[in-house]
Amino acid sequence: MNPSITLADVQAAAHRLSGHVLETPCVESRTLGRIVGARVFLKFENLQFTASFKERGALNKLARLAESGAPVGGVIAASAGNHAQGLAHHARRLGLRAVIVMPEHAPTVKVERTRSFGAQVILHGQTFDEAHAHALRTAAEWRPEVVLLDI
């Protein structure tokens, strides 16, 4: 957890996301609560368009870029799957080019879903770290049109 994140930061993010992602239900799990001896709540982020909470972080990052006023022609990121889909979906919705670098052995379903959301997918490296390093190199070559998003 980043200790420099304030309540105001969380409230600003909630405002940015409002109307663009689903307000998913939060339900108490009595079974898990009994196991751990505390109240446990489950947030059903699987109901999001991309079926993942990662969509929230991707959209918040894109919205913050838009707020900055800096010209952004596209975004590039490294991801093994869920972040890629959220970024691709919201970049397309905002009219931005999205390039996602994924490890060569990323699950086919994640690669294809990312492409279906309009992103260009580059498969590179055996590990996430290798894909991330390639994304950094690619971003350095494409600047200033592409901004690296690293979540």
Protein language model regions, located:
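PLP-dependent amino-acid enzyme catalytic core
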Residues: 1-151
